[in-house]
From Swiss-Prot:
Protein name as annotated: 1-deoxy-D-xylulose 5-phosphate reductoisomerase
Functional pathway: Isoprenoid biosynthesis; isopentenyl diphosphate biosynthesis via DXP pathway; isopentenyl diphosphate from 1-deoxy-D-xylulose 5-phosphate: step 1/6
Catalysed reactions, semicolon-separated: 2-C-methyl-D-erythritol 4-phosphate + NADP(+) = 1-deoxy-D-xylulose 5-phosphate + NADPH + H(+)
Domain of life: Bacteria
Positions bound to Mn(2+): 149, 151, 230
Pfam families, per the entry: DXP_redisom_C, DXP_reductoisom, DXPR_C
Alphabetized GO MF terms: 1-deoxy-D-xylulose-5-phosphate reductoisomerase activity; manganese ion binding; NADPH binding
InterPro entries associated with the record: DXP_reductoisomerase (IPR003821), DXP_reductoisomerase_C (IPR013644), DXP_reductoisomerase_N (IPR013512), DXPR_C (IPR026877), DXPR_C_sf (IPR036169), NAD(P)-bd_dom_sf (IPR036291)
Organism (species): Shewanella oneidensis (strain ATCC 700550 / JCM 31522 / CIP 106686 / LMG 19005 / NCIMB 14063 / MR-1)
Length: 396
């Protein structure tokens, strides 16, 4: 039985992971649940899954949770970064689901990697920010890294074993691969009039046509920054060159991504848009377990369509692809700027189209610096956030 730590337990990925665990109770045990400040949600999860440890990033939330948990459950409640790192690196832990949204997930995820754990990577920002450092830490520790994002998981499933077992260091061309085709639905504004985008509200941006997700990733899907971050993540996971990676708009979200081979073959991974499928795949790889997802009904799907991305509609996608070509410093800046901009949009402080403008301004204006350590990455991230917050007044 695998002991699992779930980082981001109260989010959508956390909920899907717990659903898969519940469907396979003899194979997995919830060792620890980690969340930011959602006391009520965490209390409910603790009562249902009886973890050994419940960790709250927010100290006051930890105190509130401890006061409400029945003492008879004997659940240890912790808080603080040092305690979180000790938790994910504990000898009893086999697998870490890394599903904390944003830059906040980098430090604990990297700690789990350095400890040689089996890491199920749902936090794309970890690779967007730390890329080479993250991949090198995986190689040095012998950690097992498995991609949870539906697109990267789909790509992984379509690749030969010699690539799967050498993520970040593989040679796609040597394995006969010509292109990775990263699919995206285009989000809720794919066919909206360009002139109407500036007036789009957070509620509209969060209404994804196919996927059920949290607010931040939903807005990223509406701007297609999510696909841009996935482009950067794919570059590091699969060691791609720029011309080996392409974005394809696929509105139905049935094909989750594809791999094109030198001989003209294209292998695609398909399924209903439900995160329990890639989560179950990562949890059990190289075996297969029940996910609880209904099999794809091709007669109900009916039609599959594809188109090229429109960079006038999705400037954030263009910025991410450009930042990827510039290097690690640029992608770290872009990620930090985007987190500030999306947060401000969700709070009603800026308009939808201001997100891309703030991202572009930060990418052009924040001084880049060499990043040789995690401390350098965190410093550049913090510097960018300060600059991005100063920009908000310009667009308010």
């Amino acid at each position: 039985m695998q002991n699992m730590v779930i980082l981001g337990a109260t989010g959508s990925i956390g909920a899907s992971t717990l659903s898969v665990i519940s469907a396979n109770p003899t194979a997995y045990r919830v060792y620890a649940l980690v969340a930011n400040a959602s006391v009520d949600k965490m209390l409910t999860l603790c009562l249902a899954h009886r973890p050994q440890v419940a960790h709250m990033v927010d100290h006051k939330a930890a105190l509130a949770l401890k006061a409400q948990l029945p003492a008879a459950l004997n659940i240890q409640v912790t808080s603080g970064e040092d305690e979180l790192i000790a938790l994910v690196t504990a000898p009893a832990v086999d697998t870490v689901m890394a599903a904390i949204v944003g830059a906040a997930g980098l430090v604990p995820t990297l700690a789990a990697v350095k400890a040689g754990k089996r890491v199920l990577l749902a936090n794309k920002e970890a690779l967007v920010m730390s890329g080479e450092l993250f991949i090198e830490a995986t190689r040095a520790s012998g950690a097992t890294l498995l991609p949870v994002d539906s697109e990267h998981n789909a790509i992984f499933q379509c690749l030969p074993e010699e690539v799967q077992s050498n993520l970040g260091r593989c040679d796609l061309a040597a394995s006969g691969i010509s292109h990775i085709l990263l699919t995206g639905s285009g989000g809720p504004f794919l066919t909206a009039e360009l002139s109407n985008l500036a007036a789009m509200t957070p509620a509209q941006a969060c209404k994804h046509p196919n996927w059920s997700m949290g607010p931040k990733i939903s807005v990223d899907s509406a701007t297609m920054m999510n696909k841009g971050l996935e482009f950067i993540e794919a570059r590091w996971l699969f060691n791609t060159q720029k011309d080996q990676l392409k974005v394809v708009i696929h509105p139905q979200s049935v094909i989750h991504s594809m791999v094109q081979y030198r001989d003209g073959s294209v292998i695609a991974q398909m399924g209903n848009p439900d995160m329990r499928t890639p989560i179950a795949h990562c949890m059990s790889y190289p075996q297969r377990i029940r996910s609880g997802v209904e099999p794809l009904d091709f007669f109900k799907v009916g039609q599959l369509s594809f188109c090229e991305p429109d960079f006038n509609r999705f400037p954030c996608l263009a910025l991410a692809i450009e930042a990827c070509s510039q290097g690690q410093e640029a992608t770290t800046v872009l990620n930090a700027a985007n987190e500030i901009a999306v947060e401000a949009f969700l709070q009603g402080k800026i308009g939808f189209t201001h997100i891309g403008k703030i991202n572009e301004d930060c990418l052009l204006s924040v001084p880049k610096q060499a990043m040789a350590s995690i401390e350098d990455i965190i410093a550049l991230d913090a510097q960018t956030r300060i600059y991005a917050r100063e920009l908000l007044a310009k667009f308010a």
